[in-house]
């Protein structure tokens, strides 16, 4: 896990937490803190948000099944896929592959966002009072809390 400053001028976040290795379907799944970060973002966003779009609540329920365990399992992959399916409705170029890759900026193609950058942006929107101090969230995993002072 590391911080990145996006180059894109319209970025919804000025800085975001990036993963070092891919997480999800056919991914590296090498770093527990990367997996924890993706799981934490998915779960907290799903717990804090509601959906009014058709199919949105079913996707939210799939994301709520994601454990915050640091192990990439079928529920984590399905949660990533559910997130991407929902975002594809708004950003048609979003790739739905059940995988979060390390981002090189916010967008990978016009209107297609890196999953990890998008998760950062929505988390920031939902929790503006603590952003970027993830460690202040009551459900932040201990491994993430321990790592953040080195990054911020």
Model-derived features: positions:
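Cell-envelope/ECM-targeting effectors and their regulatory/trafficking segments
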Residues: 1-152
